[in-house]
Amino acid sequence: MRLFGYARVSTSQQSLDIQVRALKDAGVKANRIFTDKASGSSSDRKGLDLLRMKVEEGDVILVKKLDRLGRDTADMIQLIKEFDAQGVSIRFIDDGISTDGEMGKMVVTILSAVAQAERQRILERTNEGRQEAMAKGVVFGRKRKIDRDAVLNMWQQGLGASHISKTMNIARSTVYKVINESN
């Protein structure tokens, strides 16, 4: 059994020092501590990727706190399952939680349920926000293409910018912009 450590900060203002010190105090050698800073996406987690390549069956990964392993609950659960499939257990120092043994399996099951509830809650909030925005007239999707020829034809026919903007459902300033660009 080899001990590895993983530390992650989600913003550039946070420091890895406290996490790294805790990992060393727990017995992890400095060359087996992997870190990631201010990672917004999973593709940016070089420390985690290196850790994935180094660990083998029977190894243990120490992490200072539960929330330091993944960016969100779903990400954390996916990582726990991935390491569990390799025969690698994870221990969270501050939380006193370990993924090995029957108790560990139960913890993972509970966390999976929490992750599912979190995904559902996010989906509900997203839909509520979208409906609220639509009620306020926010238009989703790509900006539609303006038919510049139609705007210019109407202008040449002597129609005013206000009439053109209402007919074409575009801003009056857009009408003037199209006219000025054509000159």
UniProtKB/Swiss-Prot annotation:
Coiled coil: none annotated. It comes from the Bacteria. Belongs to the site-specific recombinase resolvase family. Residues 161-180 bind DNA. The active site is at S10. One of its GO terms (biological process) is DNA integration. Keywords: DNA integration, DNA recombination, DNA-binding, Plasmid, Transposable element. This is Transposon gamma-delta resolvase. SUPFAM superfamilies: Homeodomain-like, Resolvase-like. This protein catalyzes the site-specific recombination of the transposon and also regulates its frequency of transposition. GO terms for molecular function: DNA binding; DNA strand exchange activity. Signal peptide: none annotated. Residues 2-137 form the Resolvase/invertase-type recombinase catalytic domain.
